[in-house]
């Protein structure tokens, strides 16, 4: 049936709109937003309201675009000072953790395939490992979204470690998936070929991501565009240039865009705030489209025959394969990472869109059992998002790994672009501060430091040196540079609490 472009746009917009409304309902009950998008697609799909979508190729290509932009945005939001202490364990989790999860889970699937479950599910050893490989990585979109939407403040640098793992482990899962598909199609691949492929993918991916990221920063800061909105479009172009260039050089494009995102996000960048806002919007749109599309792609009635196998695999992966892989991967770090932290890392093995996208590769390659692989991976993803996603904050609290969120109230709504090179701090006027002086000129502020605005109740005051301060006033300081400013304020009063920090 031919559908006009107007009808197609109307249906697409309506689906996205309904998904957003469903996500609001799910948020009230603690259901992950991305799970609601997935369920919305299933509701409107073939077994629901009857919208037919069965083009695996289109789903794979849209997923590829999403898996370029989402990790790049996550990389831009990752601060090097946060991940530097957890860089080594994060890399171990993203490499050996994925490999061990594939090995343990693949052997379990092969063992289960020998059971007489009357489900029609049966895999060879390579096929079992392929199924495990497609879902061996945690999903960056799901982990970034859940950690940030639930506003969990984790101890022991766990949040940057988890975001580093989820942002950088897709390349390993992708590589294992491709190699195992080649093994099934060609009848075998030599060990040297596998080792060379691993080295080439990671070395070219890391080097290409870093070098092209540095080149992107240099070009953005020097191009001198008259229209500020074009900088965001330029960054979007760089994302795809980086991915495709590294891919053509036989490197891992997904790893490259994540590395490039970290390089760009941790550099002085013209219009960084505007670029970040644009990419955040793009990330949300792609997450909605990707999960909604994957929900439309699956036929729930086809998952019923594999349901028992999928549940067994999900339970084994969650409670055996993932924890065992985490413990073994983190052995070199001894007691630096506590057992409670390892337990929580094991629980945050959330599956999402990436495993489902990787499960489309066997379908496109037409390997034996590809449809079963896709349906099992989809079912495991549903279980993971539902149980692990919903219980994330509860598990963190039970393990004693949370701490109160720092207050981030913004009373002034003022942000500075990075090229200004100044720092804003919001400070509460306390008794201790008033003991140093009741007027601004008595505070002995260093050169270059100004009180640019005061909030008193509901009033905003542009102060001068003779203004008398009152208990409860909120002072907005501005100073060029950061460290000297912090030392100055600490010198004024050790009891002052910093409530707002904005340095872009």
Where do the protein language model's features map onto the residues?
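Transmembrane helical cores of multi-pass secondary ion antiporters/exchangers
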Residues: 1-409, 418-419
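Short beta-strands and strand-coil junctions in structured, solvent-facing domains, enriched
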Residues: 78-81, 270, 300-301, 436, ...
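Long, charged amphipathic helices and adjacent flexible linkers at domain junctions
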Residues: 404-424, 496-504
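Short, solvent-exposed amphipathic alpha-helical segments in soluble enzyme
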Residues: 362-363, 400, 443-445, 468, ...
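Cytosolic Rossmann-like ligand/nucleotide-binding regulatory domains
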Residues: 433-482
């Amino acid at each position: 049936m031919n559908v006009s472009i107007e009808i197609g746009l109307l249906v697409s917009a309506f689906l996205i709109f309904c998904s957003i409304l469903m996500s609001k309902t799910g948020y009230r009950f603690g259901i992950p937003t991305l799970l609601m998008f997935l369920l919305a697609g299933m509701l409107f799909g073939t077994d629901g309201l009857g919208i037919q979508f069965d083009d695996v190729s289109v789903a794979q290509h849209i997923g590829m675009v999403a898996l370029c932009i989402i990790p790049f945005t996550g990389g831009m939001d990752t601060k090097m000072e946060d991940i530097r202490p957890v860089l080594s364990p994060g890399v171990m989790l993203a490499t050996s953790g994925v490999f061990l999860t594939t090995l343990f889970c693949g052997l379990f699937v092969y063992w289960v395939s020998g059971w007489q479950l009357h489900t029609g599910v049966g895999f060879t050893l390579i096929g079992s490992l392929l199924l495990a490989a497609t879902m061996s990585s945690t999903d960056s979109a799901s982990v970034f979204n859940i950690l940030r939407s639930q506003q969990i403040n984790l101890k022991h640098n766990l949040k940057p470690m988890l975001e580093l793992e989820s942002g950088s482990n897709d390349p390993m899962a992708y590589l294992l998936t491709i190699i195992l598909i080649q093994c099934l199609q060609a009848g075998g691949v030599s060990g040297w070929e596998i080792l060379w492929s691993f080295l080439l993918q990671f070395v070219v991916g890391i080097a290409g991501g870093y070098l092209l990221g540095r080149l992107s920063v240099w070009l953005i800061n020097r191009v001198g565009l008259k229209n500020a909105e074009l900088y965001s479009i330029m960054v979007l172009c760089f994302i795809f240039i980086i991915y495709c260039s590294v891919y053509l050089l036989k490197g891992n494009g997904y790893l490259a865009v994540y590395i490039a995102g970290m390089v760009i996000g941790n550099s002085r960048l013209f219009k960084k705030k505007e670029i970040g806002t644009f990419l955040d919007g793009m990330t949300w749109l792609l997450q909605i489209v990707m999960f909604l599309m994957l929900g439309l792609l699956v036929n729930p009635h086809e998952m019923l025959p594999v349901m028992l196998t999928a549940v067994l695999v999900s339970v084994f992966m969650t409670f055996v394969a993932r924890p065992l892989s985490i413990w073994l991967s983190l052995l070199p770090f001894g007691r630096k990472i506590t057992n409670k932290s390892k337990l929580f890392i094991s629980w945050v093995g959330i599956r999402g869109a990436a495993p489902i996208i990787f499960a489309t590769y066997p379908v496109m390659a037409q390997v034996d059992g590809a449809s079963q692989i896709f349906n099992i991976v989809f079912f495991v993803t549903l279980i993971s998002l539902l149980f692990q996603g919903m219980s994330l904050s509860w598990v963190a609290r039970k393990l004693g790994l949370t701490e109160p969120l720092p207050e981030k109230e913004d009373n002034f709504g003022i942000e500075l672009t990075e090229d200004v090179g100044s720092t804003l701090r919001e400070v509460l006027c306390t008794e201790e501060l008033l003991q140093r002086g009741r007027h601004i000129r008595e505070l002995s502020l260093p050169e270059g430091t100004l009180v640019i605005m005061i909030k008193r109740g509901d009033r905003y005051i542009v102060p001068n040196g003779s203004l008398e301060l009152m208990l409860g006033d909120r002072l907005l300081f501005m100073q060029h540079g950061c460290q000297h400013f912090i030392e100055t304020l600490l010198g004024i009063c050790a009891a002052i609490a910093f409530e707002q920090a904005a340095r872009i």
